[in-house]
């Protein structure tokens, strides 16, 4: 006579068992579509920008192949790239892509910051200069101090601010080095 296996009964009331997280099929499809779109953004990058993104060898080969393909073959390759993304952590890739895409915004923000610092230097003088040189010790204190005084005189006399532009250029070189 054959032995019967005892059926394992799942106790829904037992809190010691692992919590099961159910994911809907629609959510899985949305995630897959997001990864496919991420792959498409990466495929559309130039080679120089592509080198800035941390990709493993198989993924890089798949992306380079997708850049050469057209129409339906490209669509299938993008599906494959999305599948490869499902097996890895994509956060470092997304962060690198965001840096590349937002480079213009970052530069604009930095230029606005430089302009704000320049305005503070002309308004507050030596106090603002000391704060600036604490943050950026490579700055030329004497030259900046002379330019600040010249800019303040030009401002008082309502002359075109040649010294202000020179301060701006010095700060741009100083702050964009970092």
Curated annotation (Swiss-Prot):
GO molecular function, one term: ribosome binding
Gene3D superfamilies, sorted: PSPTO4464-like domains (1.10.60.30)
InterPro entries: DarP, DarP_sf
Record has Ribosomal protein as a keyword: no
Biological role stated in the UniProt entry: Member of a network of 50S ribosomal subunit biogenesis factors which assembles along the 30S-50S interface, preventing incorrect 23S rRNA structures from forming. Promotes peptidyl transferase center (PTC) maturation.
Organism of origin: Haemophilus influenzae (strain 86-028NP)
Keywords carried by this UniProt record: Cytoplasm, Ribosome biogenesis, RNA-binding, rRNA-binding
Annotated family: Belongs to the DarP family.
Lineage: superkingdom: Bacteria
Protein name: Dual-action ribosomal maturation protein DarP
